Amino acid sequence: MVVKAVCVINGDAKGTVFFEQESSETPVKVSGEVCGLAKGLHGFHVHEFGDNTNGCMSSGPHFNPYGKEHGAPVDENRHLGDLGNIEATGDCPTKVSITDSRITLFGADSIIGRTVVVHADADDLGKGGHELSKSTGNAGARIGCGVIGIAKV
């Protein structure tokens, strides 16, 4: 059973991101476009809560149900919500194209109802040596976010 979801990002960064998963055993395909980003890499994460009542700040930390350290999407030791970076050319829109085998749209660990956050700076993937590297990737301010909702299949 295919599950689809969508996230409308608002803030200084704006855009729409789509999620699709064919079954609980297959990767999630993430695609979309974001505008309002400076040229360079920008951290792109799923945060724990679908609460945007205080803007992006109320979305909580990265979605991390297994108590792991922050890491790269390819790392075994990573938050489930660690989707790495998107790269902006400085022109609108920035394309989002990610395939991830760790996030899911099914079951207790589903990202549906949680928040996508776009950050001002590059995610150092937990390898930057900064005091925030192992928790946030030192990705800077939260410049855009939106709640992931179920979409029509």
Curated annotation (Swiss-Prot):
GO terms for cellular component: cytoplasm. It is found in: Cytoplasm. Pfam families: Sod_Cu. The keyword Ion transport does not apply. It comes from the Eukaryota. It is an enzyme of class 1 (oxidoreductase). Homodimer. This is Superoxide dismutase [Cu-Zn]. It comes from Drosophila orena (Fruit fly). The gene is Sod1.
